[in-house]
């Protein structure tokens, strides 16, 4: 079976919250693309099952008053990550946009990806505008 995709998602509704029973909404939340990325990150990571957020997860983040959010998407999803950052910043959520370069969280391993997450400062409006100007 040859495919250009690493993982092929089934054609079913994705409006679910991955690992919902394991999420602690009171501590920083990490949004990532897929389940393997969430497993590699481990710490309160929620997979989007794609590059965009589904309504159920968005409502849970806002409804549970998440205070700090890390967005960890692959480089090919930078415009999606910028859009998510902008959206959650508008709700007053401290948002961190983790730049992975050409790497993938599931390939980086637990220590490296978590160090990168830990080292990422919160976005401010200036940095968000820079991302929008140079990446979209």
Report the location of each language-model feature.
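Replication-associated primase and helicase/ATPase modules
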Residues: 31, 62, 66-72, 81-136
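Short, acidic/turn-prone active-site loops that include or flank metal/cofactor-
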Residues: 49-55, 74-76, 100-102
